[in-house]
Amino acid sequence: MYNINDLIYNWSFALFDLANDEGILKELTADVVKVIKVLKRNKRYLEILNSYNVDLDVKFQKIDEAFSGNNIHLINFIKLAAKAAVAKFLIQILVRFVEISNQKLNVKYGTIFTTIALDEVKVKEFESKISKKLNAKVILKNEIDPSLIAGIKIKIDDYVVENSISGYLNELKKSVIKK
Protein backbone atom coordinates (compact mmCIF):
# COMPACT_ATOMS: atom_id res chain seq x y z
CA MET A 1 0.00 0.00 0.00
CA TYR A 2 1.23 3.46 -0.79
CA ASN A 3 0.94 6.69 1.14
CA ILE A 4 -1.43 8.97 -0.79
CA ASN A 5 0.43 12.15 0.22
CA ASP A 6 3.70 10.67 -1.04
CA LEU A 7 2.02 9.63 -4.27
CA ILE A 8 0.60 13.11 -4.81
CA TYR A 9 3.92 14.78 -4.03
CA ASN A 10 5.98 12.39 -6.18
CA TRP A 11 3.74 12.77 -9.21
CA SER A 12 3.50 16.55 -8.85
CA PHE A 13 7.25 16.89 -8.35
CA ALA A 14 7.93 14.69 -11.39
CA LEU A 15 5.85 17.06 -13.55
CA PHE A 16 7.54 20.07 -11.94
CA ASP A 17 11.00 18.61 -12.56
CA LEU A 18 10.16 17.95 -16.22
CA ALA A 19 8.74 21.45 -16.76
CA ASN A 20 11.67 23.08 -14.98
CA ASP A 21 14.25 21.08 -16.97
CA GLU A 22 12.48 21.88 -20.25
CA GLY A 23 12.26 25.59 -19.36
CA ILE A 24 8.47 25.64 -19.71
CA LEU A 25 7.47 25.99 -16.07
CA LYS A 26 5.48 29.21 -16.45
CA GLU A 27 3.61 28.04 -19.55
CA LEU A 28 2.90 24.58 -18.17
CA THR A 29 1.64 26.04 -14.90
CA ALA A 30 -0.85 28.18 -16.84
CA ASP A 31 -2.06 25.08 -18.71
CA VAL A 32 -2.33 23.10 -15.48
CA VAL A 33 -4.49 25.82 -13.88
CA LYS A 34 -6.89 25.58 -16.85
CA VAL A 35 -6.97 21.77 -16.64
CA ILE A 36 -7.71 21.90 -12.90
CA LYS A 37 -10.72 24.14 -13.57
CA VAL A 38 -12.00 21.74 -16.23
CA LEU A 39 -11.53 18.69 -14.00
CA LYS A 40 -13.24 20.36 -11.03
CA ARG A 41 -16.27 21.13 -13.20
CA ASN A 42 -16.34 17.59 -14.64
CA LYS A 43 -15.68 15.13 -11.79
CA ARG A 44 -17.30 12.34 -13.84
CA TYR A 45 -14.41 12.65 -16.29
CA LEU A 46 -11.94 11.47 -13.62
CA GLU A 47 -14.16 8.48 -12.88
CA ILE A 48 -13.93 7.48 -16.55
CA LEU A 49 -10.15 7.92 -16.59
CA ASN A 50 -9.81 5.81 -13.46
CA SER A 51 -12.28 3.10 -14.49
CA TYR A 52 -11.02 -0.39 -15.23
CA ASN A 53 -14.10 -0.91 -17.43
CA VAL A 54 -12.95 1.66 -20.01
CA ASP A 55 -10.28 0.58 -22.48
CA LEU A 56 -6.97 2.43 -22.21
CA ASP A 57 -7.11 3.49 -25.89
CA VAL A 58 -10.54 5.04 -25.29
CA LYS A 59 -9.16 6.90 -22.26
CA PHE A 60 -6.23 8.21 -24.32
CA GLN A 61 -8.59 9.33 -27.08
CA LYS A 62 -10.77 11.18 -24.55
CA ILE A 63 -7.67 12.86 -23.08
CA ASP A 64 -6.51 13.95 -26.56
CA GLU A 65 -9.97 15.34 -27.35
CA ALA A 66 -10.36 17.18 -24.05
CA PHE A 67 -6.87 18.64 -23.71
CA SER A 68 -5.56 18.97 -27.28
CA GLY A 69 -4.74 22.67 -26.89
CA ASN A 70 -2.43 22.10 -23.94
CA ASN A 71 1.26 21.28 -23.69
CA ILE A 72 2.13 17.77 -24.92
CA HIS A 73 3.97 17.01 -21.67
CA LEU A 74 0.78 17.71 -19.71
CA ILE A 75 -1.31 15.57 -22.05
CA ASN A 76 1.15 12.68 -21.73
CA PHE A 77 1.24 13.18 -17.95
CA ILE A 78 -2.55 12.82 -17.77
CA LYS A 79 -2.35 9.70 -19.96
CA LEU A 80 0.30 8.23 -17.68
CA ALA A 81 -1.90 8.95 -14.64
CA ALA A 82 -4.79 7.15 -16.35
CA LYS A 83 -2.55 4.20 -17.24
CA ALA A 84 -1.19 3.96 -13.68
CA ALA A 85 -4.73 4.20 -12.24
CA VAL A 86 -3.97 7.34 -10.22
CA ALA A 87 -6.31 9.60 -12.20
CA LYS A 88 -8.61 9.83 -9.17
CA PHE A 89 -5.85 11.90 -7.53
CA LEU A 90 -5.21 14.06 -10.60
CA ILE A 91 -6.74 17.26 -9.18
CA GLN A 92 -4.70 16.98 -5.97
CA ILE A 93 -1.55 16.17 -7.96
CA LEU A 94 -2.03 19.16 -10.27
CA VAL A 95 -2.88 21.52 -7.39
CA ARG A 96 0.31 20.42 -5.61
CA PHE A 97 2.25 20.99 -8.85
CA VAL A 98 0.91 24.56 -9.03
CA GLU A 99 1.95 25.15 -5.40
CA ILE A 100 5.50 23.91 -6.07
CA SER A 101 5.66 25.84 -9.33
CA ASN A 102 4.40 29.09 -7.77
CA GLN A 103 7.03 28.79 -5.07
CA LYS A 104 9.74 28.53 -7.74
CA LEU A 105 8.19 31.31 -9.87
CA ASN A 106 7.63 33.53 -6.80
CA VAL A 107 3.89 33.83 -7.41
CA LYS A 108 1.48 34.46 -4.54
CA TYR A 109 -2.30 34.32 -4.58
CA GLY A 110 -4.52 36.39 -2.37
CA THR A 111 -7.92 37.90 -1.89
CA ILE A 112 -8.98 41.52 -1.83
CA PHE A 113 -12.11 41.96 0.27
CA THR A 114 -14.28 44.98 -0.49
CA THR A 115 -17.82 46.16 0.16
CA ILE A 116 -18.52 46.41 -3.58
CA ALA A 117 -17.12 44.53 -6.59
CA LEU A 118 -13.96 46.01 -8.07
CA ASP A 119 -13.40 46.17 -11.81
CA GLU A 120 -10.43 44.35 -13.36
CA VAL A 121 -8.39 47.56 -13.68
CA LYS A 122 -8.61 48.32 -9.95
CA VAL A 123 -7.69 44.74 -9.02
CA LYS A 124 -4.65 44.96 -11.35
CA GLU A 125 -3.60 48.23 -9.67
CA PHE A 126 -3.70 46.57 -6.25
CA GLU A 127 -1.81 43.56 -7.62
CA SER A 128 0.91 45.84 -8.96
CA LYS A 129 1.31 47.76 -5.70
CA ILE A 130 1.34 44.65 -3.50
CA SER A 131 3.69 42.85 -5.92
CA LYS A 132 6.25 45.62 -5.48
CA LYS A 133 5.84 45.57 -1.71
CA LEU A 134 6.20 41.77 -1.42
CA ASN A 135 8.77 41.48 -4.23
CA ALA A 136 6.66 38.74 -5.84
CA LYS A 137 4.04 38.42 -8.56
CA VAL A 138 0.71 38.73 -6.76
CA ILE A 139 -2.60 37.56 -8.21
CA LEU A 140 -5.70 38.76 -6.39
CA LYS A 141 -9.32 37.74 -6.59
CA ASN A 142 -12.02 40.13 -5.42
CA GLU A 143 -14.56 39.00 -2.83
CA ILE A 144 -17.39 40.98 -1.33
CA ASP A 145 -17.30 41.14 2.49
CA PRO A 146 -20.44 42.72 3.93
CA SER A 147 -18.83 42.86 7.40
CA LEU A 148 -16.40 45.55 6.17
CA ILE A 149 -17.51 49.08 6.85
CA ALA A 150 -16.05 50.89 3.84
CA GLY A 151 -12.45 50.36 2.75
CA ILE A 152 -10.57 47.19 1.80
CA LYS A 153 -8.81 44.20 3.28
CA ILE A 154 -6.11 42.28 1.38
CA LYS A 155 -4.99 38.84 2.53
CA ILE A 156 -2.06 36.97 0.97
CA ASP A 157 -0.88 33.99 3.03
CA ASP A 158 -0.05 35.52 6.44
CA TYR A 159 0.26 39.05 5.02
CA VAL A 160 -2.83 41.17 5.74
CA VAL A 161 -3.48 44.80 4.86
CA GLU A 162 -6.65 46.27 6.26
CA ASN A 163 -7.76 49.79 5.58
CA SER A 164 -11.37 49.83 6.66
CA ILE A 165 -13.50 51.38 9.35
CA SER A 166 -14.33 47.94 10.77
CA GLY A 167 -10.58 47.25 11.04
CA TYR A 168 -10.03 50.48 12.95
CA LEU A 169 -12.99 49.71 15.23
CA ASN A 170 -11.61 46.23 15.99
CA GLU A 171 -8.19 47.71 16.83
CA LEU A 172 -9.83 50.31 19.06
CA LYS A 173 -11.86 47.59 20.79
CA LYS A 174 -8.70 45.51 21.43
CA SER A 175 -6.83 48.49 22.87
CA VAL A 176 -9.75 49.38 25.18
CA ILE A 177 -10.02 45.77 26.41
CA LYS A 178 -6.27 45.67 27.20
CA LYS A 179 -6.54 48.76 29.41
Curated annotation (Swiss-Prot):
It is found in: Cell membrane. It comes from the Bacteria. It is a peripheral membrane protein. One of its GO terms (molecular function) is proton-transporting ATP synthase activity, rotational mechanism. It holds the Pfam family OSCP. Keywords: ATP synthesis, Cell membrane, CF(1), Hydrogen ion transport, Ion transport, Membrane, Transport. Transmembrane segments: none annotated. InterPro entries: ATP_synth_OSCP/delta_N_sf, ATPase_OSCP/dsu. One of its GO terms (cellular component) is plasma membrane. Belongs to the ATPase delta chain family. F(1)F(0) ATP synthase produces ATP from ADP in the presence of a proton or sodium gradient. F-type ATPases consist of two structural domains, F(1) containing the extramembraneous catalytic core and F(0) containing the membrane proton channel, linked together by a central stalk and a peripheral stalk. During catalysis, ATP synthesis in the catalytic domain of F(1) is coupled via a rotary mechanism of the central stalk subunits to proton translocation. F-type ATPases have 2 components, F(1) - the catalytic core - and F(0) - the membrane proton channel. F(1) has five subunits: alpha(3), beta(3), gamma(1), delta(1), epsilon(1). F(0) has three main subunits: a(1), b(2) and c(10-14). The alpha and beta chains form an alternating ring which encloses part of the gamma chain. F(1) is attached to F(0) by a central stalk formed by the gamma and epsilon chains, while a peripheral stalk is formed by the delta and b chains. This is ATP synthase subunit delta. It comes from Metamycoplasma arthritidis (strain 158L3-1) (Mycoplasma arthritidis). The gene is atpH.
